Amino acid sequence: ESAAAPGTTAGLLRRLGVDVEPSRDPRDLSEGQRLALVLAIQLSAEPPVLLLDEPTRGLDYSAKADLTAIVRELASAGMAVLISTHDVEFAAGVGRRTLLMADGELIAEGTTLDLLASSVAYAPQLAKVFAPSPVLTAADLAGVLR
């Protein structure tokens, strides 16, 4: 609906860039559309805390960028957002504080940027988010670690 209010499920779906016919059966939606629908329903209730489990799964790059912007806005407005994800690029784009787990054990915690910058394994993802050039240099990492 083009006249849907911004805080409604239809308005939130439009904000996420997802066009879903109201009469469509949710089982006929793509995985990304279903995830966007669930998120829109959750947000329309205006919860004080938002829990997201692998929220970028099934989303295309554009929808992921929209979700990143929405999560940042919600956090800036004071909403607590707890995210479980394997998407390092998304975590780097929205996270302030991160807990890293391996085999069910907490192995590190700290600011997202510090944790990601401290591991060479995350260099490709960090390059996508933070590096001004297509190549992440030692100087880029040194600047992040300061």
Model features per residue range: what roles?
Residues 105-127:
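Conserved beta-strand-loop-alpha-helix hinge in the C-terminal portion
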Residues 54-55:
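Walker B catalytic motif
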Residues 85-86:
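H-loop/switch region of ABC-family ATPase nucleotide-binding domains
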Residues 60:
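ABC-family nucleotide-binding domains
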Residues 91-93:
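A short, surface-exposed alpha-helical micro-motif characterized by mixed small hydrophobic
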Residues 122-146:
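ABC ATPase nucleotide-binding domains
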Residues 25-29:
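Conserved ABC ATPase signature
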